[in-house]
């Protein structure tokens, strides 16, 4: 990670860390790096429903105009909507203003290249180097060469038309409960499933600028669980603030996470002959039960570091078409270039319709191992990988597990923490293993 760019673009508290001044620089220098080979580059800009979105959009767009870009403002739209439209409309770049599942005070800015994919580390480093130069030496067009800005709010409808084409058949007879987190999918998802002839009940669809992700959405699926049971829905679909994640709820109100959704869809696509190389790409955080269930179905798996960008990189490299994270970032590369909550929802409902099974029946085919994750505050998180005593206790625990469990000890990507995760046959064993390992981590490098 760089000075400004984290694992998913630039993010911070709006108007305090992510200021309008910084947004202007990101627009100016980021826009230049992505469009410097084009005389009048087209750049699409979308945002979620946060109150700070208008402020940051104005500053970001000003930066883009200062390098001569033709900016098209999409208004409120999901992150995957920006990704799709950037490629579909032959734009040089796309920008999304959102902090995804974070609380309302945060916001963020993430770029997409003309191919619809997120930026590489090299591109982000180039942007940061330009931003930190003592003197701004970028060209400054004047007069007719200055950039222009226009609204293209029809972009959302163009994106919905694309999504509708990914449904194998209409959804007549399926009662869908949606939780849109008072975010970017609030209007889009409701129209999408109604147009596909599903019976639709909604919650989290009344954004006021301040209530995004507040007790709703994919990070709070328990709210949808209650709603599904109240409405008697067949399936609940929870998105996050910018619509790039999906967590589902079955007809009994039980939560179905990203691992389970990936397994369900991958198994169905394999049966249809549509799973490339019979392989799924996931991160090291996926549940051990996920891998065992895939293996049972003759499906191979590849693991990457945590972060959907690393999943996408592995998929692109070897041509795989299904991947994702337990958190609900699910990528179906045949259709879109990034995690897409609404697309994932269609893939899941396609499977329900085709199999005639309930979501609880499909989810039961993957037996999840009990999992426990504990964060330990440390003085230097990177030293954990070299510490001999930590390595020794991990080896000791793994020997006891004898293949019926898994240990993962890694530094956090964003905080001064070491994450200790255990999966085992029982919750009691998870507790025991994590307690033993965290005790050694604290003793060796912990801080109060």
From Swiss-Prot:
Post-translational modification Phosphoserine, affected residues: 100
Protein keywords: Isomerase, Magnesium, Metal-binding, Phosphoprotein
GO MF term list: magnesium ion binding; phosphoglucosamine mutase activity; phosphomannomutase activity
Residues annotated as binding Mg(2+): 100, 240, 242, 244
Details of cofactor binding: Binds 1 Mg(2+) ion per subunit.
The enzyme's E.C. designation: 5.4.2.10
One Gene Ontology CC term in the entry: cytosol
Pfam families xref list: PGM_PMM_I (PF02878), PGM_PMM_II (PF02879), PGM_PMM_III (PF02880), PGM_PMM_IV (PF00408)
Family indicated by similarity: Belongs to the phosphohexose mutase family.
Function: Catalyzes the conversion of glucosamine-6-phosphate to glucosamine-1-phosphate.
Name this polypeptide is given: Phosphoglucosamine mutase
Source organism: Bacillus pumilus (strain SAFR-032)
